[in-house]
């Protein structure tokens, strides 16, 4: 097929010459342009078939690229650059740690966002003596690149640049509960080698379902000796605490120049301008916030955010991201325990004047604002934070304890895992449990990671609700092993967002929409099988609303099946009335609900799938049905997938391995889609 297309394109100039009297110059130009586009498409389609498929997410506005990171490295005397593909900030944090490590080996490193540079410049990297490029690449969702690595991934797919002489290493961040574990890290590692680059250390694969921090430390402690051996250098000293930012206190600053929680542009919340994205969120008013379940054990809620006049567009299956705020009680306690005035206006300025990152968070601001809106104070701190903090513990035993947990020894790793990670000790808890640990608040703010946006599957259809985005969420609250009660940052914050607001003022939520590949079939007549227990029902509320809307427009709509699961019908049956109405009206062909705690034996969604196996097989094999699974990745999604393997094997009929291939092909064709989390 490829050859026939090449032959056709080769004859185009001759054909055009013969017909010149029949076509105008404009016709010829347009015709040639079309043929050129088709030829380009077929060439690159063939290339893309040889590598894993990632779905491209369109960004609203392409960022401005710097001219050359190699020239910048030359100018600033760097020989190591660490690029990061980061969605939640962890890969960026690891990249910063690696670039900071370089000084111990007589080298100079810099971390960089691939979105800010032209990666075609990689071929010029060998011009720098003993140069090395490292990639810390996270995989997002079902095998996708992170938003900031999308352009880099596209370039890797299409380029044929010769990277001979380029030395590289890759550390991937993934989660084994997902189907495509560390797909991005694996692809970057493989593709760089294909292009001629030389791998100087093995690919690292971090697993967030296990202990990502330990995976990184283990890889890192073997990575640097390999770098030393390859380049013939020696470590110049032990790891030491080096401040990256300097504190500047502003005595008489105009408050109009002070950040109060904005993510990007100063005063962007007062003067909102589209397009809205992660760096420019929209302040949406909460119009509805109602509890969905009975009882007091858990709080499941439905929120509606007003996006009128925002020009935000979304489709069923997209995600809404919200920027939460930390609990003011925790913020005040940190201020009290450190004896700090939280309302001091300050800036943390990068000591490296050549760095693109001038501040760790928007500055100037106050400590209160930083701890409330910009810094993560509720997740267990990583080992590098403990190492830096240890110097401020005046009690030797506490300092030793912190140093041990920050070490790479087996005992230290076990201690960190049990005392920090498994006990879910956040920074306030550590300060409370170590009475002599009293770091300067500015250094603490430098060390803490950024507070990240939280993503939720949109629970509405824009066809029905074009001016609002709906969220379905459960308020997270649990008792940690330390005996403390921990609460989820975003869900606890959202829970307080009442439509009336305080003193009659509107409750506002900074938000933006992230496009997804979790999409209804193009043809409304295609049957859909939706599996979503608990809050996994959220995107299906949008799907069902849209299918109902299509029916109202007089369109023929295929079978719409929902497999939903909850504990008890009188406790946590979400959207019970709405689902019953859709079922009664015929928009929902089947409403199948599994109650796990309503009878002696537990019933889950996979049990109902097995019950309906013959009909499901007919819909899949003969009707071309699309399958959608949303919810827990660790257990539910795997159990459901195994159930479909069994159904396919039984009615195929075929061997188990063939059934697995059958389902995997459904995934490749976009007929088996996942929106899962762990």
Curated annotation (Swiss-Prot):
The protein's required cofactors: FAD; FMN
Catalytic reactions on record: 2 oxidized [cytochrome P450] + NADPH = 2 reduced [cytochrome P450] + NADP(+) + H(+)
EC number: 1.6.2.4
Gene Ontology biological-process entries: carnitine metabolic process; cellular response to follicle-stimulating hormone stimulus; cellular response to peptide hormone stimulus; demethylation; electron transport chain; fatty acid oxidation; flavonoid metabolic process; negative regulation of apoptotic process
Positions carrying N-acetylglycine: 2
Domain of life: Eukaryota
FAD-binding FR-type domain sequence ranges: 279-521
Residues binding FMN, per UniProt: 86-91, 138-141, 173-182, 208
Membrane-traversing stretches: 23-43
Positions annotated to bind NADP(+): 298, 535, 596-597, 602-606, 639
Domain Flavodoxin-like stretches: 80-224
One term of GO molecular function: electron transfer activity
Textual note on the cofactor: Binds 1 FAD per monomer. Binds 1 FMN per monomer.
Subcellular location: Endoplasmic reticulum membrane
Alphabetical UniProt keywords: Acetylation, Endoplasmic reticulum, FAD, Flavoprotein, FMN, Membrane, NADP, Oxidoreductase, Transmembrane, Transmembrane helix
Family: Belongs to the NADPH--cytochrome P450 reductase family.
Name assigned to this protein: NADPH--cytochrome P450 reductase
Organism lineage: Eukaryota, Metazoa, Chordata, Craniata, Vertebrata
């Amino acid at each position: 097929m490829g050859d026939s297309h090449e032959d056709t394109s080769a004859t185009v100039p001759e054909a055009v010459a013969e017909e010149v009297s029949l076509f105008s110059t404009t016709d010829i130009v347009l015709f040639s342009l079309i043929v050129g586009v088709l030829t380009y498409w077929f060439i690159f389609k063939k290339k893309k078939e040889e590598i894993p498929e990632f779905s491209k997410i369109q960004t609203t506005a392409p960022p401005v690229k710097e001219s050359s990171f190699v020239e910048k490295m030359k100018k600033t005397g760097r020989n190591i650059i660490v690029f990061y593909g980061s969605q939640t900030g962890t890969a960026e944090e690891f990249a910063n740690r690696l670039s900071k490590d370089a000084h111990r080996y007589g080298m100079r490193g810099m971390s960089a966002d691939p979105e800010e540079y032209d990666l075609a410049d990689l071929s010029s990297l060998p011009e720098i003596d003993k140069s090395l490029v490292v990639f810390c690449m996270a995989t997002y969702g079902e095998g996708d690149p992170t938003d900031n690595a999308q352009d880099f991934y596209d370039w890797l797919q299409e380029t044929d640049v010769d990277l001979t002489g380029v030395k590289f290493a890759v550390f991937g961040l993934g989660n084994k509960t997902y189907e495509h574990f560390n797909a991005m890290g694996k692809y970057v590692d493989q593709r760089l080698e294909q292009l001629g680059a030389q791998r100087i250390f093995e690919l690292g694969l971090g697993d967030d379902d296990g202990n990502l921090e330990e995976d990184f430390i283990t890889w890192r402690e073997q990575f640097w000796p390999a770098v030393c051996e390859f380049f013939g250098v020696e470590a110049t000293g032990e790891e030491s605490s080096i401040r990256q930012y300097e504190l500047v206190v502003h005595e008489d600053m105009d408050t109009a120049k002070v950040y109060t929680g904005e993510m990007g542009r100063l005063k962007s919340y007062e003067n909102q301008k589209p397009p809205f994205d992660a760096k420019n969120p929209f302040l949406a008013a909460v119009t509805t916030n109602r509890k969905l379940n009975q009882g007091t054990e858990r709080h499941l809620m439905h929120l509606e955010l007003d996006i009128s006049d925002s020009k935000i567009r979304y489709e069923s299956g997209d995600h809404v991201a919200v920027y939460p705020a930390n609990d003011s009680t925790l913020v005040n306690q940190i201020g009290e325990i450190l004896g700090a005035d939280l309302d001091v206006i300050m800036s943390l300025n990068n000591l490296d004047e050549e760095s693109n990152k001038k501040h760790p968070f928007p500055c100037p601001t106050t400590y209160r604002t930083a701890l409330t809106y910009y810094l993560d104070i509720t997740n267990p701190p990583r080992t590098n934070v403990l190492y830096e903090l240890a110097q401020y513990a005046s009690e030797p035993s506490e300092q030793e304890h912190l140093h041990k947990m920050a070490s790479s020894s087996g005992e230290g790793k076990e201690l960190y895992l049990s005392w920090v990670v498994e006990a879910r000790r956040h920074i306030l808890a550590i300060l409370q449990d170590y009475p002599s640990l009293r770091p300067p608040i500015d250094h603490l703010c430098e060390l803490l990671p950024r507070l990240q946006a939280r993503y939720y599957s949109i629970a509405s259809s824009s066809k029905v609700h074009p001016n609002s985005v709906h969220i379905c969420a459960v308020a997270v609250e649990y008792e940690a092993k330390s005996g403390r009660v921990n609460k989820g940052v975003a869900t606890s914050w959202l829970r307080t967002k009442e439509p009336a607001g305080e003193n009659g003022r509107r409750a506002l939520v900074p938000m933006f929409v992230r496009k997804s590949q979790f999409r209804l079939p193009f043809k409304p007549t295609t049957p859909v099988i939706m599996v979503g227990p608990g809050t996994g029902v959220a995107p299906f509320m949008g799907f069902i609303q849209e299918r109902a809307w299509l029916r109202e427009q007089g369109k023929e709509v295929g079978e719409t099946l929902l497999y939903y699961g909850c504990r008890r019908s009188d406790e946590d049956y979400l959207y019970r009335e709405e689902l019953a109405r859709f079922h009664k009206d015929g928009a929902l062909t089947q409403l199948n609900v599994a109650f796990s705690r309503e009878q002696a034996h537990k019933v889950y969604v996979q049990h109902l799938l097995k019950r309906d196996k013959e009909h499901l097989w007919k819909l899949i094999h003969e009707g071309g049905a699309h399958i959608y699974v949303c919810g827990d990745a660790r257990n539910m999604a795997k159990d459901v997938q195994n159930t479909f393997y069994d159904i396919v094997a039984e009615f195929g009929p075929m061997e188990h391995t063939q059934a697995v291939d059958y389902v995997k092909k459904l995934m490749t064709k976009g007929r088996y889609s996942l929106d899962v989390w762990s």
